[in-house]
Amino acid sequence: VRIAINRDPKAIRKTLLEVRPTLMCNVPRFWEKVYAGANERIARSSGPLQRIFQDAIRTGREYVLNYRRTGEKAPRTLALKFGLYQKTVYGALKRAVGIEHGNIFPVAGAPLSDEIAEFLLSVDIPIVYGYGLSETSATVCCYPTVGYTLGSIGTLMPDIDVRIDPENNEILVRGKTIMREYYRKPEETRCAFTPD
């Protein structure tokens, strides 16, 4: 397993083209830039290319959101058209970004707009949107492979319990992946935990 860490956010494009990751965790801001870049490229394209891009996005949206997301089998012509766009339009976009080998791209740290999530999924970029914290060893909940709902942060991970504190609306999380303490910070640890 090869691990790469991009220490300079301004160099992410260069790093991606060099590393070409299969898995990459990132924040929504990265995907906002991918989305903006794709839309700029579409806008600069000739009329026929714009129509192809738009059809590819429509096809992907229908295939991914109506069939792949629900676990249902897509009609043959739609599946064939989606497969063609995977090898051409979606593939070209992913190669341009450096993510053509990507199997999963967890996204968290801030809200991801439904418009951008829908676009990414429609062009066959395998994002998994979720919620978590350093204190929870990352993921509390995320999109399942099938049955996720855009606009949500997915479903709870196994062995995790979540409730909302009625006094302050704070999210309370319990489970095996929750940290035991802040290192050498007993007061912060005490403040971070409820009695149960």
Q: What name fits each language-model region?
A:
Residues 21-102:
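Alpha-helical "lid/cap" subdomains adjacent to substrate-binding clefts that gate access
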Residues 11, 30-32, 135:
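Conserved nucleotide-binding/hydrolysis micro-motifs of P-loop NTPases
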Residues 1-4, 124-126:
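A short helix-loop-beta submotif of the ANL/AMP-binding
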Residues 15-18, 37-38, 185:
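Residue-level signal for well-ordered alpha-helical positions
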Residues 9-10, 28-29, 50, 110, ...:
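Alpha-helix N-cap/helix-start capping motif
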Residues 3-19, 25, 44-48:
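ATP-dependent adenylate-forming carboxylate-activation enzymes
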Residues 15, 34-36, 138-140:
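Short, charged, surface-exposed secondary-structure boundary motifs
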Residues 24, 64, 81, 85-196:
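Conserved AMP-binding/adenylate-forming
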